[in-house]
């Protein structure tokens, strides 16, 4: 009888755990579906001294942070667009539009672009002040990885989801277990279960160990606030 009760309890625990896992997966899927429409591919031309490998063009990821009748503002990292010209955005291989740099900060490695395309889906920024208690939590990144020479047919067709964990909070960076590949710089980094954007993908530190860094979103908000204040918004 005791064994039977214990077995039932164990079965209930397993069912509850499975239900929690399904709920977490559903939340992750919902987060991706909500954020994806605002993530854009940035394509550009770069000077010869900035060229890498065989590419004449350069690519990065950005995401819309504000939009209205005046156009749309897109956030990315400054190093990705440094010295670039002929900037364009693409969303899901459907919408193509020119863009220009309206603000940048080399120290923060942030840049703000503007496109004349109006009323695009945008992403609300979260907060990075509370993240110390979230170390170990699952995170996601939505970006446009640059294809290698063996796979160049999917570029610009769809965003790619990259998943990992928030592994450490540093003074001016979030350490993540994400292998941030070329093209994903500038992508939003978000908490899987809530979809809260807490950082911007910046660089890969260790390819073998899949260690990357993201800029804390509070630094991003400060950058945007200073831009708005300087322009009377």
Regions picked out by a protein language model, each given a short descriptive name:
Residues 23-29, 45-74, 95-98, 186, ...:
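A conserved glycine-rich beta-strand in the N-terminal activation segment of trypsin-fold
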Residues 34-49, 139-141:
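A short, Trp-centered hydrophobic/proline-enriched beta-strand micro-motif
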Residues 63, 179-201:
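Catalytic nucleophile loop of clan PA
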Residues 23-32, 42, 87, 120-122, ...:
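C-terminal cap/linker of serine protease catalytic domains
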Residues 59, 65-110, 115-118, 139, ...:
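Catalytic-histidine neighborhood of serine endopeptidases
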Residues 1-10:
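Bacterial N-terminal signal peptides that target proteins for export
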Residues 27, 121-174, 180-184, 202-212:
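Flexible, gly/ser-rich surface segments that form the specificity/activation loops bordering the active-site cleft
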């Amino acid at each position: 009888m005791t064994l039977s009760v214990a077995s039932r309890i164990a079965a209930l625990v397993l069912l509850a755990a499975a239900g929690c896992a399904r709920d977490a997966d559903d939340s992750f899927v919902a987060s991706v579906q909500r954020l994806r429409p605002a993530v854009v591919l940035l394509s550009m031309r770069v000077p010869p001294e900035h060229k890498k490998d065989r590419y004449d063009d350069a690519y990065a990821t950005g995401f819309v942070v504000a939009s209205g009748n005046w156009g749309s503002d897109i956030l990315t990292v400054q190093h990705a667009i440094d010295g670039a010209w002929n900037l364009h955005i693409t969303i899901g291989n459907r919408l193509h539009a020119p863009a220009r740099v309206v603000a940048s900060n080399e120290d923060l490695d942030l840049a703000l672009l503007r496109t004349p395309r109006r009323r695009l889906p945008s992403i609300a920024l979260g907060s990075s002040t509370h993240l110390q208690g979230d170390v170990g939590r699952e995170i996601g990144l939505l970006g446009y990885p640059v294809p290698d020479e063996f796979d160049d047919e999917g570029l610009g067709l769809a965003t790619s989801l990259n998943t990992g964990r928030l592994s450490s909070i540093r003074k001016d960076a979030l350490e993540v277990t994400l292998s941030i590949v070329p093209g994903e710089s500038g992508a939003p980094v978000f908490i899987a279960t809530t979809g809260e954007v807490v950082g911007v993908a910046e660089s890969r530190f260790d390819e073998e160990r899949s260690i990357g860094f993201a800029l804390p979103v509070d630094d991003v908000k400060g950058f945007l606030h200073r831009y708005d204040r300087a322009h009377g918004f």
